[in-house]
Amino acid sequence: MELFELTIHELHDKLKKKEVSSVEATESMLARIEAVEPKVNAFITVTADQALKDAAEADKRIADGDMDKLTGIPVALKDIFLTKGVRTTCASRILENFIPPYDATSVARLKARGAVLVGKLNQDEFAMGSSTESSYFGKTSNPWNLECIPGGSSGGSAAAIAAQQATATLGTDTGGSIRQPASHCGCVGLKPTYGRVSRYGVIAYASSLDQVGPVTRDVTDCAIMLEAVAGYDAKDSTSVDLPVPEYTKALTGQVKGLKIGLPREYFIEGLDPDVQKAMDEAIATYRQMGAEFQEVSLPHTDYAVATYYLVATAEASSNLARYDGARFGHRSHEAQSLLDMYRKSRAEGFGEEVKRRIMLGTYALSSGYYDAYYLKAQKVRTLIMHDFIKAFEQVDVLLTPVAPTPAFRIGEKTSDPLQMYLSDIFTIPVNLAGTCGISVPAGLSRAGLPIGLQLIGKPFGEENILRAAHAFEQNTDWHKRRAAL
């Protein structure tokens, strides 16, 4: 087995026993990136030289007995996290040459534990998309089928795990942007509860929805990564001051007596038959393990996508107002005046989907429409939140599909934004409710594409969904399947 194929916990054991060094593991990963990157395009920036220096430092730490679960582990980050001295583009022309002067909190926490950054990953521009086709740096391909999308917006984060180009990655999830690509690429992806992980230093898309989370090869790795980045941060006023549990201790493999809810609004006509089959098999697996099932209702699910595309675009139009060519980012050389510079820098710097969402959001916030659209959307959001609260009075976790279909072909939905938006129909409600959800590999379609299972927990119920996901993993082998690149 090559070093680049190992999980965090497998590589940690080898590093601890001094069977391998972090430099060797990092060299193996960099060679793997070089070999498969032309096919996948998961990275925007590869930080090879710095990675080898950091790996040498990690080896010193290990020799001195100062070792954490992540010391010497090669990781990669979605290019939405600010990284001191390393270009951060958010996959946009407007930030093509932006080099941040500081690290995001989650990046600083990984570095403090001795993780080795091998690069920054491709995504949809400003995290707006479900397919990683809108990046200024070119589309990313799904390692399971290079003609298919990896999902989005954290497509690079999932594709890099599927292609074994990083041991673990971090992404962000605003409406499904970790869980949907994890499902399409056969990885584990966790969207924590809003406020569980600091957003400081993460380029904002929709501030009341964005959340940082890991994409990994198995649930144990996911728990290790969440332990590392979770916790209160005074620099983010929305981060919650709660102790961080040892998530790995929750992985008991036991779900006997666990009450699992099946939301009737998620098992709808039109669900891809391969997805339905994977869900039926997952339910049967949980029954064999002693879990109990109950049908529940989340009646306002039908309004989730419309609500999301008002709230998220309104927040995006406000957040993206800061990109004007004045202090940082792309500045138009054609401008004749200050106003002209703002206009032309933004026109040249933003891609089509970003412009579409800025216009949608600006319209929703405009005078005379604020009450009709934005305010009404926030009220419906509250109803969606109450649906989850009521459901969790009856059950411990919810089980649903992640996406209505397996990965679709590149270019299939780019001409129809509404079709693209509907691919997040099962993930968006979790963001609107501010709770947590995880995607776990649960099957393959007849075409050989991965299908993910979504487990949704109560707010700050990450231990519950990690335990349930880990138990499923112990009784199936889907997480061990690898894309044949």
Curated annotation (Swiss-Prot):
Pfam families the UniProt entry points to: Amidase (PF01425)
Superkingdom, natural source: Bacteria
Gene Ontology BP annotations: translation
Gene3D superfamilies listed in its UniProt record: Amidase signature (AS) domain
One of the record's GO cellular component terms: glutamyl-tRNA(Gln) amidotransferase complex
Enzyme class: ligase
Catalytic activity: L-glutamyl-tRNA(Gln) + L-glutamine + ATP + H2O = L-glutaminyl-tRNA(Gln) + L-glutamate + ADP + phosphate + H(+)
Keywords of this entry: ATP-binding, Ligase, Nucleotide-binding, Protein biosynthesis
GO MF annotation terms: ATP binding; glutaminyl-tRNA synthase (glutamine-hydrolyzing) activity
EC nos: 6.3.5.7
Annotated active site: 78 (charge relay system), 153 (charge relay system), 177 (acyl-ester intermediate)
Xref: PROSITE patterns: AMIDASES
Task performed by this protein: Allows the formation of correctly charged Gln-tRNA(Gln) through the transamidation of misacylated Glu-tRNA(Gln) in organisms which lack glutaminyl-tRNA synthetase. The reaction takes place in the presence of glutamine and ATP through an activated gamma-phospho-Glu-tRNA(Gln).
PANTHER family, per the entry: GLUTAMYL-TRNA(GLN) AMIDOTRANSFERASE SUBUNIT A, TRANSAMIDASE
Known partners and oligomeric status: Heterotrimer of A, B and C subunits.
Family that this chain belongs to: Belongs to the amidase family. GatA subfamily.
Protein name according to UniProt: Glutamyl-tRNA(Gln) amidotransferase subunit A
Lineage, opening ranks: Bacteria, Pseudomonadati, Thermodesulfobacteriota, Desulfuromonadia, Geobacterales
